[in-house]
Each structure stands twice: as C-alpha cells, then as structure tokens.
C-alpha cells in the first residue's frame, strides 16, 4: 500500500456495513426414506437473517435456480450483492442474469471455502439440527411442507441471539415495544399461550388477554 492510500476494509467490516443489501444463497441435500436425493435451495438476507426463499427440487438446474430468485427477491428491497459458491449450477449465464435482471453484484466465494458463505452454512446446520434430523422424509412434497412450516417459525417465532435477541420478520419487531413495560404488569392482564410447531418439535409462545 502506497503512502496516502486508504486501507481496504476487512470482509467482516464490508458485510457489517452492507448487511441489509446483501443476500446469500446455497443448496443443501436431504435424503428421503427411499434414499432419493433432494436439493433444498435457500436465500437469506444477511442483515435480518430472514429466509427470503426456500424451495425443493430433485433436479437442480440453472433455470430452476434463476426462477427461485424471481420468486424470492422482492422489488420493494434494494439488494445490491449476492453471495454464492462456485457450484456448476451457478453458471455464467445465471450470474449475468443476476447482474442485468436483478442489478446484483455477484460475490463468488473462493474455491473449497464454505466458511466464506458462513451465513448460509450456519443456516444449513440450523435446519439440520432443529428440523430435519428429527424427520423421516417421504418425498419432495413432504419435505417442502416441513420446510414451509419451519421457515415460518424461523422467521417469525424463533429468537436469534445475533439480533439482540430478536426475530427476523419486521412484523414481529413491535415486540420490542414491550421491553419498557414490566413483566408483572403484562402478566397481570394476559396469559401465555403455546402453539406447537411441526407436531410439537418446537413451540412458540405469545401473550393472550386474560
């Protein structure tokens, strides 16, 4: 670095400064009871940790993957970057469409460096530990239904320590308003109700007027 040049920010600093404008995506593999290989595609927003899209296919391809971006990325949000690995599914044509059609700058991870897509890698591990490790998958439709319910729970009912702890969905941010109110005053007027998730594998709790 020459004298007078500004030092380049670290990757961690870049991600922290642009988190709400970055999405990351990845595939994970799930195996059914009949040993059929299914592929789960995930898109996550780094800033909120919210899962923007999740879908399943037995035959992943570039065109199918591009369609998932069309379904998962809202026009209301101005995303600028997408992180993905060097899987052959992410073809040059797909990346070109992400640049031209979505206005995204593609950030490729280095070869054989899963930690460079750490947000997705952690999400994949969470899905396995909290959901799929407890399930016997029957087929593609069954897996899709399980993930649909779990993603809803992950986004709207599961606290994340990295968020404060908080919950990814904007619709649930109003819970923060209750922090200034004492627990005793809330409990005197309401009762706690429980809602089972995935047949009782997890539960969500909420206040209900007494």
Describe each region flagged by the PLM.
Residues 1-210:
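Charged DNA-binding/catalytic regions of mobile-element recombinases
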């Amino acid at each position: 670095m020459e004298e007078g040049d500004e030092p380049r920010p670290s990757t961690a600093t870049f991600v922290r400064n642009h988190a709400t404008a970055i999405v990351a995506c990845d595939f994970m593999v799930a195996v059914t009871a009949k040993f059929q290989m299914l592929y789960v595609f995930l898109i996550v927003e780094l800033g909120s940790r919210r899962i923007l899209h999740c879908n399943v296919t037995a035959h992943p391809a570039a065109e199918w993957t591009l369609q998932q971006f069309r379904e998962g990325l809202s026009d209301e949000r101005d995303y600028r970057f997408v992180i993905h690995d060097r899987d052959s599914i992410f073809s040059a044509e797909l990346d070109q469409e992400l640049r031209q059609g979505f206005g995204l700058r593609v950030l490729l991870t280095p070869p054989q460096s899963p930690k460079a897509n750490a947000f997705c890698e952690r999400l994949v591990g969470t899905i396995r530990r909290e959901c799929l490790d407890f399930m016997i998958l029957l087929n593609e439709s069954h897996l899709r239904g399980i993930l649909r319910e779990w993603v809803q729970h992950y986004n709207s009912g599961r606290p994340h320590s990295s968020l404060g702890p908080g919950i990814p969905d904007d619709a649930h941010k109003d819970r923060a308003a209750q922090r200034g109110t004492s627990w005793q005053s809330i409990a005197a007027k309401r009762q706690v109700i429980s809602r089972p998730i995935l047949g009782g594998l997890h539960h969500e709790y909420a206040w209900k007027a007494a």
